[in-house]
Amino acid sequence: MLTRPACRSVAYAETFKDRSVVAAYRHRPPHPPGTFDLLRQLIVDRPRSLLDAGTGLGDLARALAPNCDRVDAVDFSERMIEMARSLPGGDDPRIRWLCSPIEDADLIGPYSLITAADSLSWFDLNVVIPKFAELLTENGVLAVVDRSAQVGLREDDIIPRYSLNRDYERWDPVAALEKAGLFERLGQECSGPVPWTPTIEEYIERRHSQNGFSRDRMSRRRATDFDAALRARIAEQVKEGSVRMEEGRLLGEVAGSVVWGRPVPRLRATSERGILGPTRQ
């Protein structure tokens, strides 16, 4: 069995149902245009159907719907789904919004593309990977989408000091799946970087959209002190020139990454390697 680290437990995932987190989510950096271009190219089978697993505010679902016959956009946060519906493209009739954990969702395959943007690490991979394998078309793939944004801010000492996720550790779910023989990587492509220019307040709110920084869960004092620490560090680095601002906006950038491949059915993985056995040499 693949075991998620404690920092990716259901208890921590519940943060994404919080009203404050959903409100702050729109301040996350956008995916670079190249990410969407690549995802469109990965849809080769018909029907041109997309499953966006852990859709959040539906950034991928809303952008790709015009290129699809149908889209199932799934998230376990009702507030996320409500917000996604209200955003541009959220009323596209090709999108079916489903509020459900992906593990239990009532899905109607087959899908020519399954996307997981910043969400795969929160799933029970022992359940969803065999499920995805069954739902894909012959040439369909699972695309794991990531993005990284930076403005040059030194905050590695600030983040752990205030985060409520005391179990945080870096974990790569794709690497874990590959090691277990449950994912066959077919390709990887990066896009960007492209400019990202948030205001200071937008940058801070972006942090509050992340696990560990929900305003609904932090004490008012803790949240206020966290915000003040970020503002002070930004001011310090702007003064020294290591963080740049122009017309009230931070000058940063965002890059995207897509890893795509085929999820491996459980029976095949078990027969080839033993039950989640050692990595094939």
Map each language-model feature to its residues:
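Conserved Class I S-adenosyl-L-methionine
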Residues: A176, A180-Q281
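Conserved catalytic/acceptor-binding region of the Class I
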Residues: A133-I200
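Conserved acidic residues
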Residues: R48, D69, S112
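Class I SAM-dependent methyltransferase SAM/SAH-binding core
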Residues: L51, L57-D104
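A short beta-strand submotif of the Rossmann-like class I SAM-dependent methyltransferase core
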Residues: L113-A117, L125
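A short acidic, Gly/Pro-enriched loop at the edge of an enzyme's catalytic core
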Residues: D106-I114
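A short, conserved alpha-helix within the catalytic core of class I
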Residues: F123-F132
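Conserved class I S-adenosyl-L-methionine
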Residues: L2-D45
